[in-house]
UniProtKB/Swiss-Prot annotation:
Protein name per Swiss-Prot or TrEMBL: Uncharacterized protein AF_1403
Organism field: Archaeoglobus fulgidus (strain ATCC 49558 / DSM 4304 / JCM 9628 / NBRC 100126 / VC-16)
InterPro entries assigned to the protein according to its UniProt record, in alphabetical order: ACT-like_dom_sf, ACT_dom, AHAS_small-like_ACT, CheY-like_superfamily, DUF5612, UCP006363_ACT
Domain of life: Archaea
Domain named ACT: residues: 4-79
Cross-referenced Gene3D superfamilies: 3.30.70.260, Hypothetical protein af1403, domain 2
Species classification: Archaea, Methanobacteriati, Methanobacteriota, Archaeoglobi, Archaeoglobales
Residue ranges of the TM segments: none
Amino acid sequence: MLRGLRIIAENKIGVLRDLTTIIAEEGGNITFAQTFLIKHGEHEGKALIYFEIEGGDFEKILERVKTFDYIIEIEEEESFERVFGKRVIILGGGALVSQVAIGAISEADRHNLRGERISVDTMPVVGEEEIAEAVKAVSRLHRAEVLVLAGGIMGGKITEEVKKLRKSGIRVISLSMFGSVPDVADVVISDPVMAGTLAVMHISEKAKFDLDRVKGRRI
């Protein structure tokens, strides 16, 4: 069973070492971790640490962590998988990104009403270097399942990053556009709204659409 643990602590050296040591000693396996400094509010300047832990004695972990004097808050949370679910990422030119988002959000709404959890992330971005960096970063995004690239022309460094991303297991949908990106994407779709819809259908556990069945095709 996966359980989330949110901690607010003083920003000091050794905190992560102490916490991960306790989790390991109590038999817990950390499947996801993130930490950042809080920029606003009552805990400004403090560290927010979040773990998703599989197995182990969770209650004992809580009990031991609470003993540290640098711990300000500690609370069990639902995992990101339960709250936000699988993620569709949409990158590219603003106007086309918004059209893809219409399809993706409308389809995700249908599935989420039935108990699934699918979220849609969008970022309008232009320029070869900028888009290439964004594509590269998708592999580091927790729970990202499929990327939709929306634009009029994409190639060069973007194409190379798309190739690498696909090797990591993340599917890539390209709108019909100029450049070499459509040649290396899993599928090319001419209608942006349909692209968003099919992206969500692919990662849904209840829909019957599978990108692997149309890989290499233009729709």
